Amino acid sequence: MAGHSKWANIKHRKEKMDSLRGKVFTKLAREIMVAARLGGGDPEANPRLKAAIARAREANIPNENIQRAIMKGTGELAAESYEEVFYEGYGPGGVAILLKIMTDNRNRTAGEIRHLFSKHGGSMGEAGSVQWIFEEKGYITIPKEDNPGINEEEILLLVLDAGAEDLKDEGDQFEVITAPEAFEKVKDALNNANIKTSIAEITMLPKTTVPVSGEEAQKLLKLLDLFEEHDDVQEVYANFELVD
């Protein structure tokens, strides 16, 4: 497992979600619906909705499905009532896990999530028990192999001028960190410069990470996979770093 960056959990999640394409459609539709309900149906006036639509288009969700989800969120079409909550706890190795949930039955979902935690070497905590370990950030990756001849200094100047907080060289890619409100501007600046990106999203990044390896790492990844597969789990965040 050598060579993973401290944000390996994000890459792991993306690869896992790619293998769950059918569930991704449902989860992205829910995100669009809730974003539209909370902030209105105009993506230009609703950054969360704009980001959700962008992710849906990247996943090749048909535009009519996107529009239907927006209309369900604004109340123009009948829809199930989903509540957004966060559940949190610790996994194997003392790794903090934060789950973004959308559910129509909080009691049912809480019981199922608690069962997964306890069955796989973790424990579900109280609200706020691990959320403080994470902070909301814009996160963009720039694969070097997709951008031959890329110049780190030029990218650094570009993203900082657009409002980014940091640029990291992680070997096979650059990682750009932004405040949530600067994310769209930085993303647009990269797109306008024809710089290809891989991951571009607003996420929850850990302030500190916990090293895990061997059997402990396998148990942790198994638990994270089970959370990803749960119908009510929208996002999985964890503060681990894979080491030898």
UniProtKB/Swiss-Prot annotation:
Out of the domains of life, which is the source? Bacteria
Q: Name one GO molecular function term.
A: DNA binding
Tell me where it resides: Cytoplasm
Q: Which SUPFAM superfamilies match?
A: YebC-like
Listed under GO biological process in this entry are: regulation of DNA-templated transcription
Q: Does the keyword Cytoplasm apply?
A: yes
- Gene Ontology CC: cytosol
Task: Give a single Pfam family match.
Answer: TACO1_YebC_N
Keywords for the protein's UniProt record, in alphabetical order:
Cytoplasm, DNA-binding, Transcription, Transcription regulation
PANTHER family of this UniProt entry?
A: TRANSCRIPTIONAL REGULATORY PROTEIN YEBC-RELATED, TRANSLATIONAL ACTIVATOR OF CYTOCHROME C OXIDASE 1
For this chain, the family text in UniProt reads: Belongs to the TACO1 family.
Q: What is this protein called?
A: Probable transcriptional regulatory protein CHY_1525
